[in-house]
Amino acid sequence: MQKILVGGITGSGKTTMAKGISARLNLPFVEIDGLFHGPGWTKRPEFFEDIKRVTDEPAWVMDSYGYSIVREILLSKADTLIWLDYPRWQIMPRVIKRSIRRAVTKEVLWNGNFETFKNFAQPDHPIRWAWSQFGPRRKLMSNLLSDPAYKHLEVIHLKNIRAAREWFRELARVGRS
């Protein structure tokens, strides 16, 4: 477990899990949204090259595989995929609370971007995205995992928050021994 992707729908806790794994295993953490988003929510022109550079490193933990332009690179270079496959009823309260908190506090995200209440109506807003993409993203992951090109991946399929916490506790215990 040296090149780790954490996958799941928006709001599943990918970044939190990836940061925790990074700290526990002492591996570099890479936040994919920080590489993707430029000022004004634009795509950074360097995104593809940055991903290639990062994935050529001997070890990393990345918090998503979601951008289709780099999905193949990420899945082919990773050795482990942690799939946070929680039920919708566990996802939605998390993403709603996070979006409200970010809009109220004007939390600065990547390259000066921040969520606003005005953006809640946009189809790609995290709340709407998590709802509309729940089924399609699950199907995408199942299809990807049945692709022979990705048989090399060790897949850790965590089906609810409790299972994820238990798995992480075990990782922490093993990491200390």
PLM region spans:
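Walker A (P-loop) ATP-phosphate-binding motif of ABC ATPase nucleotide-binding domains
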Residues: K3
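Hydrophobic anchor at the beta1->P-loop junction of P-loop NTPases
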Residues: V6
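The conserved Walker
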Residues: T10
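Walker A/P-loop
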Residues: T15
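NTP-dependent small-molecule kinase module
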Residues: R24, R128-S177
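Conserved nucleotide-sensing/catalytic segment adjacent to the nucleotide-binding pocket
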Residues: P28-L81, Y86
